[in-house]
């Protein structure tokens, strides 16, 4: 399972944290054990934190941090840098896809997430975004996408 958000930090403000935790727990109860996070600010980090919070009570649950390039958090706020570092330190595994930033590195990260996912959980608002690309690619490959933005705005998931 992979976790993705729309790239603008203000898109995700924590309003679905409760649903997010419930979804992660439900996926674990369905047999999912490996949760991949793209490590972007916002929903990616919130989802990673939900996995870490549940890991103690969910046997076998693991967080895989998928980092597009070393130095990803350099442009983050100080608070987000600390949050990122905490998640990265606590992750069970880290996959760093490139030594430095290059054009297309975020798409390669998104491709990696989809290529290693059976299901995608996203906070998807805008079609023209990295998350939009990820969602379209997942759906094209027949991978189920749970869009918590839609579920939060029209709560029929639970």
Label every model-predicted segment.
Residues 1-3:
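Short, small-residue-biased leader/transition segments that mark boundaries at the very start
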């Amino acid at each position: 399972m992979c976790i993705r958000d729309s790239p603008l930090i203000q898109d995700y403000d924590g309003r679905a944290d409760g649903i997010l935790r419930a979804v992660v727990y439900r996926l674990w109860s369905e047999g999912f054990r490996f949760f991949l996070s793209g490590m972007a600010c916002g929903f990616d980090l919130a989802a990673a934190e939900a996995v870490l919070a549940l890991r103690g009570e969910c046997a076998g649950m693991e967080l895989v941090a998928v980092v597009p390039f070393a130095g990803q958090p350099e442009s983050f706020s100080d608070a987000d840098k600390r949050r990122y570092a905490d998640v990265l330190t606590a992750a069970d595994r880290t996959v760093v896809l490139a030594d430095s930033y290059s054009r297309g590195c975020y798409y390669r990260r998104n491709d990696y997430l989809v290529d290693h996912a059976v299901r995608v959980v996203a906070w998807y608002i805008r079609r023209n975004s990295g998350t939009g690309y990820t969602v379209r690619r997942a759906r094209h490959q027949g991978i189920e996408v749970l869009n918590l933005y839609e579920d939060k705005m029209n709560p029929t998931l639970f």
